[in-house]
Amino acid sequence: MNDIIKKIQNQIQNNPIIIYMKGSPDAPSCGFSAQAVHAISSCGKKFAYIDVLKNPDIRLELPKYANWPTFPQLWVNGELIGGCNIILELFQKGELKKTISICDKLNS
């Protein structure tokens, strides 16, 4: 296992909610990342982020590790939830907040 994969695994394990995105929550660099961050932020939970534009090694390796080719990628409690379309679908159904609130139960 290479060092980048180990780094990704550590990030996912050490952050109950993490999004790999283009840009930052305050300044997303693509529309998909902006939409995903808006939906996640609306749930009222703190989350970590990794800007894949500033981390080209992660941008290259994460799609292979996750078996998910695009960004953003939302991970909750070590599991890949999905990209922008899935995040928005869960948000519109009211399920994203439930998915994210599981972190409170598991970490209490």
From Swiss-Prot:
- Superkingdom per UniProt: Bacteria
Q: Which family does it belong to?
A: Belongs to the glutaredoxin family. Monothiol subfamily.
Q: Has UniProt tagged this entry with the keyword Amino-acid biosynthesis?
A: no
* Main location per the UniProt record: cytoplasm
GO annotation, cellular component aspect: cytoplasm
Q: Which UniProt keywords apply?
A: 2Fe-2S, Cytoplasm, Iron, Iron-sulfur, Metal-binding, Redox-active center
Q: What does this protein do?
A: Monothiol glutaredoxin involved in the biogenesis of iron-sulfur clusters.
Q: Localized where?
A: Cytoplasm
Q: Does the keyword Iron apply?
A: yes
Q: Which residues bind [2Fe-2S] cluster?
A: 30
* Species classification: Bacteria, Pseudomonadati, Pseudomonadota, Gammaproteobacteria, Enterobacterales
Please name the InterPro entries in this protein's record: Glutaredoxin, GRX_PICOT-like, Monothiol_GRX, Monothiol_GRX-rel, Thioredoxin-like_sf
Question: By its UniProt entry, which Gene3D superfamilies does this protein fall under?
Answer: Glutaredoxin (3.40.30.10)
Q: Which residues form the Glutaredoxin domain?
A: 5-107
Xref: NCBIfam families: Grx4 family monothiol glutaredoxin
Q: Name one GO molecular function term.
A: 2 iron, 2 sulfur cluster binding
By what name is this protein known?
Glutaredoxin 4
Its gene is: grxD
Read off the PROSITE patterns from this record: GLUTAREDOXIN_2 (PS51354)
Q: Where does glutathione bind?
A: 22, 59, 71, 84-85
* Subunit and partners: Homodimer.
